[in-house]
Structure formats: structure tokens, C-alpha cells
Amino acid sequence: MPNRTVFFVSDGTGITAETFGNSILAQFSAKPRHVRRPFIDTPDKAYQVVREINDTAGREGKRPIVFITLIDTEVRGIIRSAHCLVLDMLGTFVEPLEAEFGIKSNHRVGRFDDISKSQEYTDRIEAINFSLAHDDGQSSKNLDIADVILVGVSRSGKTPTSLYLAMQHGIKAANYPLIPEDFDRGALPSALVPHKKKCFGLTIAPERLREIRHERRPNSKYASLENCRLEVSAAESMMGREGIAWLSSTHKSIEEIATTILRDIRPDRLIY
């Protein structure tokens, strides 16, 4: 898909269109150029986007791919007139559901107007604040209210997973590094012992860990393959002895890791 452009056109922020589009584009190995065009909510704005799409088609010699989330039928029709392949999330999914349910959808742009008043929003903000305060073992206070405590060697994916769980699912996720001193003692950090049942481990292939650490501290003992192998082996042995469930982050996305953790610790969050 070289020299190909993908547009994400929305009458809101464009986040839904982009998320929808990227989930489909992820099935293909090529990486096209991305263009987001949010707040396209009038015919004049739509015609401007059409000109941009047509100019792109002429320049590249291939029609662009256009993902749209547009409520207004006139605006949708204008975008559809462009020289492009239109993939319409609302037309593809919402309209068939209207027919199936026998009711019209609300057709409200984005539906974010009252999100700040919702309990879900409040829970997510609290979870984000908790995860930031308990990142990388910064604090051992209030671990009793954590939903999960991620443990593992440094750079195994604990921080991004913690923040994803907080932002997407309202999970209070702390994370705590397992370091050489812990391996020398052969025991979990003392702060984690009372909360062992809340711990979930992340491990990683030593070769991949070396690559990540080398970017941070090149040519150091910390990043050496031998040290990475020793730390990973010691961490996995410790988690096994302590009965802590764990998974490898080597070939998994943050979304896959988070979903696996949710399935194990909070399956209720998969139903809402």
C-alpha cells in the first residue's frame, strides 16, 4: 500500500473514525499516509475535504481510502462524491441496527457532551491518578485499594499496561519492578507480600529486553544480554514460587495484555 493515503473524516473529534479505521488497516502490513479531518459538520467543510481527497487521488494516481463517521446525510453525500473508497461506520453498522431494533438511533455527534458527569469518567480519572502515583514502585501506600499490581523486570511493559488499564477500563493498576536485590534475597519486595494475591507478572524474552534496554542505556551491564537472561530467569522463578500468574509481553500488544489481565482479575469489567 505504498503511496496511498487514508483519510479519517468525522463531524466530531475523529477518534472513533481513526480507531475504527486503524483496527481494519492493522490487518495489512503496509503503512499508508494518515490524514485526520475532524469537525466536518457543514457542506462547505465537506467540499473542502472533497477537494483535498481529489487532489490526493490525482497526485498519487490511486483513490484514497476514506473512513467516515458523519451524522448529517448531506455531508455524508458530499464526501461520497469524492474520488475515493468510502468506508462508512454509521451507514454500515448503525443503520442495520436501526432496522433490527425497529427504532432510530439518537444521531448525536460523538455523544461526549455529558461524559464528565458519568461515574465511569470519574472512575477512570481516579484510576489514572492512582496508576501515576504508583508507577515503578514510587509509592507503596494504599496498595490495599489497587485492583492489580503488575510486577516484572524493568522495561517489561508494566507502565504502559498500567496506564492502559486505568484509561480504558478504570482499573487501579500499580506496578512494581523486580530488581537484582530482590533476586539476591529470593523474595518479593516486602511492600508486596501483604498484597500478593493482587500481583500479576509480566515477563519478556531476554533478546527483546536487551533491545529495549539498549535504547535507554547502550553498552551497559543493565542492557547486556547475559544480565537480561539472568533477570528474566530469576523473575520467572520467583513468580512461579510465589504462585503469581504471569504472561510474556514479547509478542503481545498492550490491548492483548490488558484483556488477559482483566479476564483473570476482573472478568466483570469485560461485561458492561
Swiss-Prot record:
UniProt family annotation: Belongs to the pyruvate, phosphate/water dikinase regulatory protein family. PSRP subfamily.
Enzyme Commission number: 2.7.11.33, 2.7.4.28
Keywords: Kinase, Nucleotide-binding, Serine/threonine-protein kinase, Transferase
Record function comment: Bifunctional serine/threonine kinase and phosphorylase involved in the regulation of the phosphoenolpyruvate synthase (PEPS) by catalyzing its phosphorylation/dephosphorylation.
InterPro entries assigned: Kinase-pyrophosphorylase (IPR005177), PSRP (IPR026530)
Residues binding ADP, per UniProt: 152-159
Protein name as catalogued: Putative phosphoenolpyruvate synthase regulatory protein
Recorded GO MF terms: ADP binding; ATP binding; phosphotransferase activity, phosphate group as acceptor; protein serine/threonine kinase activity
Top-tier EC class: transferase
Domain of life the protein comes from: Bacteria
Reaction equations catalysed: [pyruvate, water dikinase] + ADP = [pyruvate, water dikinase]-phosphate + AMP + H(+); [pyruvate, water dikinase]-phosphate + phosphate + H(+) = [pyruvate, water dikinase] + diphosphate
